[in-house]
């Protein structure tokens, strides 16, 4: 039951009425949120519980139960309960509430209670304490992108190094250069591969540079960035706990209003990934006519 009235929720669901309404209101794609997105939101909730326990704002038993519930989610034990369609209205409110409700219900079970009672742990009053969709979702976007950065960079560094190695291996082979699909002036095959490696390196540098802006977090801005209902030390404590939980290098953002209202940093990071993809497509297009024969 919520202010709009009663609504049936599956008895075995860890989510609650807010999530159920979102399922009814936004049956758009039939997809579920990606795991990195869910993971990052749970990281934020875990860090918030630890922060509020540290400041004394949240009862230690409730905080410990929220942390334990978060750890279960992070161990992928409750994936089936994150059900809000990725395409939903607003700034991610339904996704935020899906996580709040799952953690609250599971925390209450761990404390000996039952699902749906929201006592002693409430999804809004405790799991979402001093938070808003408007600061958690922008922070989530930054964390989830940064969490995927390491594997991506490692993979492309391996490709770059392989291209550079082929550049050295093929440096004695002279071939006709190609412009407009016609023979041009001579060039060494090794030079071409060295150029592929150089382009990859430049693209990776742009990715890293754009990613660095994502390390500035606006968490603690609350609803509009001004930090209403938020303790003064909250942003710094959240940053410390998030660094410990995620293993990521993070910074307390200087202007939380700007970090909440603008997705420019995420758009710039996305553009560098798009540039990397374009480079790969271009390189493959270069190589295809060279390797297709005829063999001599």
Region annotations inferred by a language model:
Residues 1-296:
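Conserved, well-structured ligand/cofactor-binding cores
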């Amino acid at each position: 039951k919520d202010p709009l009235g009663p609504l049936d929720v599956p008895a075995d669901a860890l989510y609650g009425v807010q999530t159920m309404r979102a399922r009814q209101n936004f049956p758009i794609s039939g997809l579920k949120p990606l795991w990195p997105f869910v993971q990052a939101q749970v990281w934020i909730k875990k860090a918030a519980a630890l922060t509020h326990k540290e400041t004394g704002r949240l009862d230690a038993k409730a905080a410990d139960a929220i942390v334990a519930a978060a750890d279960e989610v992070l161990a992928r034990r409750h994936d089936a309960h994150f059900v809000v369609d990725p395409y939903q209205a607003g700034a991610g409110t339904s996704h935020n509430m899906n996580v709040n409700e799952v953690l609250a219900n599971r925390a209450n079970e761990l404390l000996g209670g039952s699902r749906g009672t929201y006592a002693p742990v409430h999804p809004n009053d405790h799991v979402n304490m001093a938070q808003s969709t408007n600061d958690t979702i922008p922070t989530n976007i930054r964390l989830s992108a940064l969490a995927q950065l390491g594997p991506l960079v490692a993979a492309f560094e391996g490709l770059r190094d392989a291209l550079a190695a082929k550049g050295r291996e093929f440096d004695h082979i002279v071939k006709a250069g190609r412009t407009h699909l016609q023979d041009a002036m001579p060039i060494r095959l090794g030079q071409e591969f060295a150029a592929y490696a150089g382009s990859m390196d430049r693209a990776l540098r742009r990715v890293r540079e754009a990613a660095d802006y994502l390390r500035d977090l606006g968490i603690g801005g609350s609803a509009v960035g001004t930090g209403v209902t938020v303790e003064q030390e909250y942003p710094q404590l959240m940053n410390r706990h998030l660094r410990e939980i995620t293993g990521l290098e993070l910074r307390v953002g200087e202007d939380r209003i700007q970090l909440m209202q603008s997705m420019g940093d995420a758009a710039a990071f996305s553009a560098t990934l798009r540039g990397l993809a374009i480079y790969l497509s271009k390189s493959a297009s270069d190589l295809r006519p060279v390797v297709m024969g005829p063999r001599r």
